[in-house]
Amino acid sequence: MAQVTFEEISASDFFYRNRDIAGFTNPTRAIFAAIRELVENSLDAAESIKTPPDIYVRLSFEGEASEETQIYKLRVEDNGCGIPPRHIPSAFGQVLYGSKYKLKQQRGTFGLGGKMAILYGQITTHQPATIISSTSPSSKIFMYKLMIDIQRNRPIILDRKVLLNKEGWRGTVVEFSLEGDYLRAMPKILEYFKQTAMVNPYANITFVDPKGRLYKFVRATTVMPDPPKETLPHPYGVDVELLQRLIQVTPYNSILEFLKNHFHRVGEITAKKFLEFSGVSPSKNPKKLSHEEVVRLVQMLKRFKDFLPPDASCLSPLGEELLKTGVLKELKPEFVAVHQRKPATYAGHPFIVEVAIAYGGEIPQRGGFIIYRFANRIPLLYDEASDVSVKVINAMNWRRYKVSPDMPIAIVVHICSTKVPYKTVGKEFIADRPEVRREIANGLREVARQLQRYLTRREHVDRERKRLGVFSKYLPRIAEFSTKLAGKEKPPDIEKLLRSVKRFGFEGV
């Protein structure tokens, strides 16, 4: 019988062996994923200090890796909050270490993407990453050169320097080499920047590609959405593991105080009602609950119907005005309608759906709707057919709104949540949750009705323009003939008559 060997592997070793699940499936996807993850970290860093983001991305050619792939150096620089020097090595050299594990709306979810980009670069080029950061214009600049110890999931610090901050800079620079196929990735990368600019209209984004071509996406406003707030878990979203963790760290000695202080929107009255419902004494010490009692408590939390729904104040939707600004800036349509749904919940997690529909202008006709999908202001560019938004759009009866897929129409769907229901670690598409599907459908119906009203008005205007054109063409001739027939010298003033048949304003709809 063959001997079976058991071994433990680190988190970085796991993702080294299974990098596909984080979106680094091939050189084309990998270079796109690396840029995306670092840009999103930069956006989060700037927004956390309420500063309109200024992000600079440069991709430089370094050499050929094979017949189909090349080595590039990627540099991403931002004006965000910076990283305290003691955290820099672990923040970039330890997989699943970071600031993304609190319950609030943010682009990052797993504390994984930025480290995966550096890990991928290290695997494919065997070169270290350089991290430069400053947390304040008055503080010093810290520079680290590091690699990841894959087997131990620890940073290897190769060099550390402390520099004077003469220009009063604050932010972070990440620079490393990686293998990729930019020529194949270029359309997705440029589309990513365009869509990021659309849903973050307050950001300046500059991209320099390997051929030195400069792409600038200039902010259209300095107005930013309110930053998201950290929140407590809602009782409906709690499982046994989370409840046990809360019990381990709680300073409270009664289950009543524990419920009031560790759960979202649970006050004393609600907590007492729940404890009566579940048959637990309010004075019982939560640390003395047995495993079976913890399991039963979770089951009762799910069954209790009187918990208040999650409060969406912890969320940071883009808002109708900013969404409209972004769509107008990037798509330049003839007409745009936007709608923000009221907060809703799934599995105890609050979420808000924002939708927009744009028509005409510079939107091309492609024989189908152009669909833009976003989650927490992240563009979702891959696996479109699997996304719940696309399923809802395809299932709608657009004919009732006088809309057909061959019209120049773009549809935007944005979902923000403390926990976006992604189907994969790579954050490529959103799962088909009934609550999310319902909110998307209701939002789309609202903007479709607005578009229908616009198209109806435009039909009336076109009809009246044609009618007025006929009058304008023939009335002068009729007036001239009538003048001669009546033996008059001066023809009547037909402008008054033309104004009387002008029923609509034709300067716009």
Model regions and ranges:
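Short small-residue beta-strand/loop micro-motif enriched in glycine and branched aliphatics
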Residues: A22-F24, S99-L103, P282-K284, V420-G426
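Helix-hairpin-helix
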Residues: P251, L256-S278
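Short, glycine/acidic-rich hinge or "gate" loops at secondary-structure transitions
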Residues: K50-R58, F207, D311-C314, Y454-D462
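GHKL-type ATPase core
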Residues: A2, Y72-K73, G98-R245, S283-M300, ...
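Charged regulatory segments coupled to nucleotide-binding catalytic modules in large multidomain enzymes
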Residues: Q151-I157, G180-Y202, K211-Q248, S254-E257, ...
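Short coil/turn segments at secondary-structure boundaries
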Residues: K104-Q106, I205-P210, E257-N261, L275, ...
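C-terminal extensions
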Residues: S281, K287-G360
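GHKL (Bergerat-fold) ATPase N-terminal catalytic module, capturing the glycine-rich phosphate-binding loop
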Residues: M1-W169, V173-S177, L259, V266-E268
